[in-house]
Structures are given as structure tokens and as C-alpha cells.
Curated annotation (Swiss-Prot):
SUPFAM superfamilies reported in the protein's UniProt record: Ribosomal protein S5 domain 2-like (SSF54211)
Organism annotation: Gluconacetobacter diazotrophicus (strain ATCC 49037 / DSM 5601 / CCUG 37298 / CIP 103539 / LMG 7603 / PAl5)
A Pfam entry, by short name: IGPD
Protein name: Imidazoleglycerol-phosphate dehydratase
PROSITE patterns in the cross-refs: IGP_DEHYDRATASE_1 (PS00954), IGP_DEHYDRATASE_2 (PS00955)
Pathway: Amino-acid biosynthesis; L-histidine biosynthesis; L-histidine from 5-phospho-alpha-D-ribose 1-diphosphate: step 6/9
Enzyme class of the recorded protein, top EC level: lyase
NCBIfam families on file: PRK00951.1-1, PRK00951.1-5, PRK00951.2-1, PRK00951.2-4
Domain of life assignment: Bacteria
Subcellular location: Cytoplasm
Length: 198
């Protein structure tokens, strides 16, 4: 892959103003500022373990709640992902990861298929982690999957601590997406589909 796989997205609505810069072939560097501390922590982990360089600046109506900012960040990140990945020539397409964090174990399987779907099987026993509603993690991953045109299966295999469960899920997503976006040395620049297009 000789061309840079980078993208910049600036998405503005009446509820949020989000700028994202993404480099799929980075070193895991990030600058994340969404105004939501725990969400920043998760996005930093996503960049670090995906080896993506990622800058996110999000301003949203946090005085209402965090929903719009979290969902719109997922949408904008998905848009950046689509633009950066290009025509998908030579990528592995599929990725999977099992990631532990103490007692928690999360599995993520990814397919950069052009067919957006999220299967979510994660159970949080608390409504919030810090100030963030735990139901918003599913909203983020759904918004990302739909906008990035990827299939994601996110499954909690074990865990009791909600912080650990969330973090293991983000790290597993990072590793699965890293695998799926990497160059396949045997693919010789081919589209990874029998249809010839994704």
C-alpha cells in the first residue's frame, strides 16, 4: 500500500461540532477531547491498540446529556475510516481479537465488507461508569459500524467490573480493526471479495 491511508472529517450539526483526523498506518498516537472523560479514555485505548493515529475534538450539547456527542463521534469516526481505507485493495478484510482485562474478557470480530451491522452482546450491571451512561457504548459502536460500513460482533465472554468490560471491548475492537485493515502480503493489491468489489 503505497498511498497514505488518512482522512480528516469535520462534521457539524445543531447538536455537535466534531473534527477527526485519522491515519490507519500510524503508531497509536492520539489527542482526544470530547468533554467526556471516560469516553476519551476509551478512544485513546482504541487508537493505541489499533496503532491508529487519531485526533478527535468534539464539542457537543453535554448540558443535555452525552448521547449526541458519543453517537456523532461514532458517525464521524466511521466516515473518516471509510475515506481512509479507500477501495480496500490488498487488505485482510477480516479481523478478530480476544482481549482480557483482569477478570473481563471481550471478543470482537470485524469484517470490512461494505455491509454495516453491529451484533452487541455486552452486559453492564451499572448504569454509569464515571459520568458516562453505559448504554452509550453500544450507541457508539453502532454509529461507527453503520458509518464505516463494517460488520462488528462485540461479545463479552467474562467480566464483572464494568470499567474492565468496557475497556476490554474497546481494546478488542482496536486489535480486530487493526488486523482487518492491515495489508495482506499474499493479496497483491486485490479486492478481498469473490465479487470483485466491497
Amino acid at each position: 500500500m503505497d498511498t497514505a491511508r488518512t482522512a480528516t472529517i469535520h462534521r457539524v450539526t445543531s447538536e455537535t461540532d466534531i473534527t477527526i483526523r485519522l491515519d490507519l498506518d500510524g503508531t497509536g498516537q492520539s489527542r482526544i477531547a470530547t468533554g467526556i472523560g471516560f469516553f476519551d479514555h476509551m478512544l485513546t485505548a482504541l487508537a493505541r491498540h489499533g496503532m491508529f493515529d487519531l485526533d478527535i475534538e468534539a464539542k457537543g450539547d453535554l448540558h443535555i446529556d452525552f448521547h449526541h456527542t458519543v453517537e456523532d463521534t461514532g458517525i464521524a469516526l466511521g466516515q473518516a475510516f471509510v475515506r481512509a481505507i479507500g477501495d480496500k485493495r490488498g487488505i485482510r478484510r477480516f479481523g478478530h481479537a480476544l482481549v482480557p482485562l483482569d477478570e473481563a474478557l471481550s471478543e470482537v470480530v470485524a469484517d470490512i465488507s461494505g455491509r454495516p451491522y453491529l451484533a452487541w452482546a455486552v452486559d453492564f450491571t451499572r448504569d454509569k461508569i464515571g459520568e458516562m451512561d453505559t448504554e452509550l457504548f453500544e450507541e457508539f459502536f453502532r454509529a461507527f459500524a453503520m458509518s464505516a460500513l463494517v460488520t462488528l460482533h462485540v461479545t463479552q465472554k467474562a467480566g464483572r467490573n464494568c470499567h474492565h468490560i468496557a475497556e476490554a471491548s474497546f481494546k478488542a475492537a482496536a486489535r480486530a480493526l487493526r488486523m482487518a485493515t492491515e495489508a495482506d502480503p499474499r493479496a497483491a493489491g486485490a479486492i478481498p471479495s469473490t465479487k470483485g468489489v466491497l
